[in-house]
Each structure stands twice: as C-alpha cells, then as structure tokens.
Amino acid sequence: MKNIILNPKKSEQSNYIYNGPIDKYTFGAPQLNRGFFNMKCNNPQILTEYYMMYNRYFSGWNYNYENNKDEKIEELAPGKTIFFLSRNQDSPNLYHGMGDVLGTISMMELFNITEDNVQIVFLENMYLKDDPYYEIYKKVLSRGGEPIFIKNLKQKYHISFAIHVPLNWDSPVFIRDINNTYCKHPTKTYKKLHELIDKYLDIPNFVDSFISDNETFYYPKLIIDRHNSGVKFTKCLTIIWRKVWPKNRTEQNRLMQNGPELADKLASVLPKNILVRLVNTACLPMNEQISLMKKTDYLVGIHGAGLTLGIFLPLSSIYHEILHKETWNVVLFLSMMSGHNCYFDIVKGTDNKTNGFEYVSFDENDFVEKVIKHMKENNYFQ
C-alpha cells in the first residue's frame, strides 16, 4: 500500500487530522467504534479505519472542544510508531490473546514497520502482570525498548495504533485494498506471515491458557469405527472446544457447551472421507497447536478461543467462527491475509453480569446445514 503515510510531513498533515477528543473511550470499548471517530481524510487512498487500530495523523496539537482551545500532545516516543495496548473498559480483567499478537504482527507487515521502530504502551490500570501474552508482546514489539506505562488518558498523547479496536464493517476501501494487495498473491503472503510467526513466536512450549484437561482430543465413535474399517480420510474438520477456563481467570466466556454433540452430528452426516475431531487446544503447547492447524481443512470455533492460529491452515481452507451479537473481524482479517475463506455464525447465548458472556448450546442441525453448504461452495465433496 504505497499510498499510506504513517508519518506525514508537516506540509501534508492538514489532510490527516484527528478532530475529536481523546478520552477513556477512545481505546477499548470496541462497541463504541462505529461512528465514534471523526476523521478528516481528503485522500480516498488513505484509510482511516483498519482492523485493530486507527491511524491518527496529528499535527502535534489536538483541538479540545470542551474548553475551545488547542492542547499540546505529549510525544511518548518521538520518531517511533506507538502501539497502544488496551482492554475493553467494561472487562478490565480480560487477557490479551493470540489474536492480538497475530493481528499486531500482521499490522507490522501491512505497514512495513520494523520491530526496532516500535514502542509499546500500556495503561497501568489495564495491565495484568500475570497475562501470559505479555512476554510474547514484549518479544514482538519491544525490541526497540522496554514498554512505557501511563497512568491515565487525561493527558493527551500521540498514539499511532490502538489495539483492540475492530474494523468497522463500513470500510469497503479496506476490503478492496487488502484484496488488491494480498489476496492476489496469497501464496507469497502466506509464506511471509509464516516467516514472521517463526521469527517472533519462537516459544515452542508456550501453552495458551494453562488448562489441565484430559479430554484434549475427542473423536466421535463413528470416526473411530471408520478408521478401524480402513477408511482413508482426505479432509479434516477440527472444532476448537474450550469447556472451562482456568481458575485464575474470572471470565467464563467463549465456551462451547455442546461440542461433543456437534462433533457427533457432523460425523454422522458428512462424507466418510472427512475426519471430524474436537480439540481442547488450550492445553497444548504452541508447536502442537500449530501442527494441528496444518492438518486441518475446516476450522470451527468460538471467537476468542484460538481461531487465529488458523493462519497455519493449508491455503484455501475454511474458518468458521461462532460469535454472539456481532462480528469481530480478527479472523476475517487474517483469513484475507493468508488466502483462506471465512464464515461467521451468530448464535444465541446467555449474559452473566458476574462472569461475562457464556456461550450455551445451540441448534446443531442448523449449524451442520451451514457447514455442509460452505463445504459444497468450496468443492470439499469432490
């Protein structure tokens, strides 16, 4: 994307001014992103909205509507691209996940940002010292220096990227540019992203969630019978199943209660050559999770349960993400970047004010019909 300017010269900055207040809702609270930012962008080639970030082109000053005067913006790390990592203000105990890490790495690739030119910034009150992904983030983003911690956002700061702000669906230019830039060369992009992952995530024994569960793999009995009968499997459908969170986490969301039932149903209706398995990836070391993805052709899972590792799926594979209420575009972005197909399915769930959102059982028959439809669209039955 040659037309994207990360650090416009002073003479160019009049076209790229963030013209709204910066407060606690600017970062986090992703449900507020639609229509919340007032960005001036006179050049249609310059995107103001991307997945997991907003470009903010500052002239060094921010106009404050409350007191009708300009305010000086503090430069946290002059000359560097700042990645501001926040969490949803409503769920400050949420940990960062692999989607954030892979999304960040992809942003660096998308904008040709080198790690030595990055400065990572945390809000002190939204940083968890036991967050397992913090060390990975340090590895990915902090080669140019240690993270900076700021106490609050009352002071105005120059922020280049804000992680945890999802792509607005009303950004057709984003889709166009990603297609033109990456999807025309999926093999090249796929290889490049794998090189980046190998470079940054050289932590083979890192376990995603510290979950102890004996039921790591679940193969429907029907699948076992077929295997024992000599059936050769040519395709594999993997369901990521997290039925419990570790005790040190407060959230009980992103769970699939009826995983075995869904696996049994799929195994009973799909062609015999399609292997169906239910996997609790959270208790597997990272290298085993990646190995599993490389052997999967159709990946099903709840949003936030490890779907982003599907970036390691073989080319032209399928992501099928299960969500609640609205779409989050981690998987869409990464699937487009890596030459895969992506489908969403919004299901009903229950809201628990104490433990966050918990996914409940949903209609397996309806979901299976959609899986079959997507497989037919992608010639899986040939």
Region spans (language model):
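The feature primarily captures lumenal catalytic ectodomains
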Residues: 1-382
